[in-house]
């Protein structure tokens, strides 16, 4: 248990994944990172992920309809729970394999990858992550957050930022009071 807490402290992933196995080394991703998938819906997620990382100052990211040249390979694995995912960066090929039980699972895996990139990268021009394998699935089906705009006004941009934050923390339900 203590070792697991130490690993969590090093990776700093929120919420804490079910299982994290680190190798102790890091992976420096190439200057041009390609996120690829054979699935059109996963490519739409990849495009959204790239735009979020670019907003955070990362560059050299693109998406591709093929897994062959991809640095980050997205796929669906029906053996996983619907919102579960595995993220594996332990290969000597310096690639990241991300499989989800559904599109939702892949999205949660991308949120974890973003947290790893932001935490481990000192310079956004040189992306780096720890070499690790994560197996995760939510413990609760309903994970919600509430925003009450009826009693306190928020701008559209503030609401969008709030939604991005709760999504990054794998919250799947947004309860919004407008009146």
Feature locations, PLM:
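C-terminal segment of classical bacterial N-terminal signal peptides
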Residues: 1-7
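Contiguous, structured surface segment used for ligand recognition
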Residues: 7-142
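Substrate-binding cleft of carbohydrate-active enzyme catalytic domains
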Residues: 138-179
